[in-house]
Amino acid sequence: MTKKKSHKPGSATIAMNKRARHEYFIEEEFETGLSLQGWEVKSLRAGKANISDSYILLRDGEAFLFGSTFQPLSVASSHIVCDPTRSRKLLLKKRELDTLIGKANRDGYTIVALSMYWKNAWAKLKIGLAKGKKEHDKRDDIKDREWKLDKARIMKHANR
């Protein structure tokens, strides 16, 4: 009998874009694949990716990830030129792509990268259809978050 693969310790999350949830209302989320080169996969396994300043552009019926940085490893092959900030093609189904194109063309909407993670040894990117927040919306979110923490603190001390 074959042995089952043991799950690797640690989180499946590679990178998060926390700023996206602070600056945008995320209305719809999509899971996409990434078209990567070999050295990029190695740097993802080492956790050397940054998607905090990244965004998605739709061109010629395809989606591309711009602004992300994959730091090349020092042990990477010398005959391959590593470009850490190159644009990467996103792998979406035609129906999902049509939905994104239709909704992103409305005023005030954009597509942002939310998180990057491993799913069955495949690198996946979660993207979101987003609408920008105003300053008062951001303040309301901070107020709600602080009240939630205070409420939990009060309940904890009340139960003693």
From Swiss-Prot:
Q: Can you supply one Gene Ontology CC term for this chain's record?
A: cytosol
Q: Which SUPFAM superfamilies match?
A: Small protein B (SmpB)
UniProt function note:
Required for rescue of stalled ribosomes mediated by trans-translation. Binds to transfer-messenger RNA (tmRNA), required for stable association of tmRNA with ribosomes. tmRNA and SmpB together mimic tRNA shape, replacing the anticodon stem-loop with SmpB. tmRNA is encoded by the ssrA gene; the 2 termini fold to resemble tRNA(Ala) and it encodes a 'tag peptide', a short internal open reading frame. During trans-translation Ala-aminoacylated tmRNA acts like a tRNA, entering the A-site of stalled ribosomes, displacing the stalled mRNA.
- Lineage, top-rank taxon, reads Bacteria
> Cross-referenced CDD domains, in alphabetical order?
SmpB
As for family, the record states: Belongs to the SmpB family.
Upper taxonomic classification of the species? Bacteria, Pseudomonadati, Pseudomonadota, Gammaproteobacteria, Enterobacterales
- NCBIfam families the UniProt entry points to: PRK05422.1, smpB
GO MF, any single term: RNA binding
What is the designated name of this protein? Answer: SsrA-binding protein
**Which species is this record about?**
Erwinia tasmaniensis (strain DSM 17950 / CFBP 7177 / CIP 109463 / NCPPB 4357 / Et1/99)
